[in-house]
Amino acid sequence: MDFAIKGDILYSKSLNKVKECENSYLVCVKGKSEGVYKKLPAKYKGIKVYDYTGYLVIPGLVDMHLHASQYMFIGLHMDLKLLDWLNKYTFPAESKYKDIRFAKKAYDIFVKDLTLTATTRFAMFATIHNDATLYLMNELEKTGFKGYVGKVNMDRNSPKYLIETTSKSVKDTLKWLESCEDLKNIKPILTPRFVPSCTDKLMAELSKIMKDKKLPVQSHLSENRAEIEWVKELVPKAKNYEEAYDMYDMLGTVSNSIMAHYVWPDEKGIKLIKNRNVWVAHSPSSNRNLCSGIAPIGRYLREGIKVGLATDVAGGSYLSMFRAIEDSITTSKIRNCLYDSEYYNVTIEQALYLATLGGGEFFGKVGSFDKGYEFDAIVLNERDIPTVLMSELTLLERFERYIYRSHTNVYAKFIAGKKIV
């Protein structure tokens, strides 16, 4: 169904530039944006108009990295650093998804809660369990989401209750890929958990699958300094952590790649990633909660590295991308103050870009209201924020105030032209 949205429309044009269109019309035709108009053109006369006059309308937000299976313990267990946290809390929790009855209950809660947020696209980790992963993908598909979900691969340095043999990991991955072929909007993404949990043989096999099936890849990179030292021991032929992926063409040379965190880059590694089809999934909440560090996002933006924002549930303690936007700004200021005075803070314009168009490009023409982009939009209700300044604020200022003062659920939500909320 073709339609238009009337409201105060704000979206990114580039990293440092936004477009503000007060009391305007955003037109959707066949699931794609036809652009923003001050007056509705005559050729669209008679189409349905959703009247959100006075409400702020922005593109749907893109969560570049989260673990759906960990939502069950979000907000808990923030007392350890990454590797100990995985072993004590995360791996035992993920092992529960072997029981499909448990998985259905947990994923039903997750999908219901995600639906009410501003997130419209995502790249998501499930677990090693095929049945549970397929259930998650099907539920997301039925709800109307678009994005990627990965069956996790791990054949070493994992507890007995959550580990695969190399052959079983490969076999199950191929079976999973075959089982989700009929899904239209939720697509598979290869997901080696991280180098410490995947043998060289498994990485080589996954690389073959990636090339044969033309699949994107997601994993973790340089999140924690102890992890980096461990990778040096496990893969001595790699000069750095980045090269441990690049050896298997998983660093944006063959297909698109998402690398979560990238808190501690190697100087030579930055040169590998720069100008590649690699997106850094910046996860400020998780980086803080697990005491991993503060990623140098200001530098990445100056270097031209692709960056998107992420909640990283459940290392991240929220499902709200608004809070990820806020944290991306505040943590950049802390890093700038303590370490990198030569690199700028992340601005509100840049944070909006990272949460929409910056991450959205991984999915194609996503994250903008320019003509031809997929119609992902959210409507925000600011009326719970009392103020006498409303008439004096720009749309960008209203958005800035919203992310700092309100983390309520969205008022309305559209994904590829379909009204979800």
Predicted regions and their residues:
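N-terminal metal-binding scaffold of metallo-dependent hydrolase/deaminase domains
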Residues: M1-Y44
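C-terminal cap of metal-dependent C-N hydrolases
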Residues: S14, E374-V421
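Alpha-helical scaffold segments that flank or form the walls of functional sites
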Residues: I74-F145, S169-L183
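Divalent metal-coordination and catalytic microenvironments
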Residues: D8, L26, G31, G54, ...
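Active-site gating loops and adjacent loop-to-helix segments of metal-dependent hydrolytic enzymes
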Residues: I74-A103, R156-T166, N224-V254, D327-V346
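Metal-coordinating catalytic core of metallo-dependent amide/deamination hydrolases
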Residues: D131-V263
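His/Asp/Glu-enriched, well-ordered alpha-helical/loop segment
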Residues: E243, M247-N256, I297-P386
